[in-house]
């Protein structure tokens, strides 16, 4: 229960947006969202971020948790400031900790809403020709959901990245129609 508490959510995706907005609805005293990149590089829906801001969520951009503060319970976080460096293998600018830049944030509850890096999908599926996006998800035709390999289709998180289950359900229905057409 977030009521009357200082909430800090770590992450920048749709799950983080669900957490911050739920905390607001539960009447949290304050809600902060820490993200290691800037707003333009946040993976979550821009609409969700805008809605969260309108509802009173404070975004702490270019920040990364360093350590939890508290005795027998969390009382806050020590946070490092981040600067964006050169692009990494995915093409996104790599977050780099700024030396001696830490600051503290008060928190009664800390929620980690962090995603995971995708695996090397071409290697995992034994097909080095399988195309992926700069995010590491499978690249598909927008209309048919077919990959660059004829007869190989994909749907859900493997093409979107971590997302909501309703999108996976929609994708599953759409790709079933495409597969049926392909087989006929």
Protein language model regions, located:
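Rossmann-like NAD(P)H-binding beta-loop-alpha module
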Residues: 1-28
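Rossmann-like dinucleotide-binding cores of NAD(P)H-dependent redox enzymes
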Residues: 20-67
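FAD-site-proximal beta/loop scaffold in flavoenzymes
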Residues: 1-4, 88-162
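A structured beta-alpha segment of the ubiquitous adenosine-cofactor-binding alpha/beta core
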Residues: 62-108
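Cofactor-binding loop segments of dinucleotide-utilizing enzymes, especially the Rossmann-like FAD-
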Residues: 12, 35-38, 116, 157
């Amino acid at each position: 229960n977030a009521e009357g508490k200082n909430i800090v959510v770590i992450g920048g995706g749709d799950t983080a947006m669900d957490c911050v907005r739920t905390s607001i609805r539960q009447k949290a005293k304050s809600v902060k969202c820490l993200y290691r990149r800037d707003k333009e590089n946040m993976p979550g829906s821009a609409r969700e971020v805008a809605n969260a801001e309108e509802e009173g969520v404070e975004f702490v951009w270019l920040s990364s948790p360093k350590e939890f503060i508290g005795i027998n319970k969390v009382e806050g976080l020590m946070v490092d400031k981040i600067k964006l460096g050169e692009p990494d293998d995915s093409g996104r600018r790599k977050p780099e900790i700024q030396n001696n830049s830490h600051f503290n944030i008060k928190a009664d509850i800390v929620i980690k809403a962090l995603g995971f890096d995708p695996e090397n999908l071409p290697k995992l599926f034994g097909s080095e020709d399988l195309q992926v996006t700069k995010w590491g998800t499978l690249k598909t035709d927008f209309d048919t959901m077919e990959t660059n390999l004829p007869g190989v289709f994909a749907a859900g998180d493997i093409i979107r990245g971590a997302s909501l289950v309703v999108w996976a359900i929609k994708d599953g229905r759409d790709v079933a129609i495409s597969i049926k057409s392909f087989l006929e």
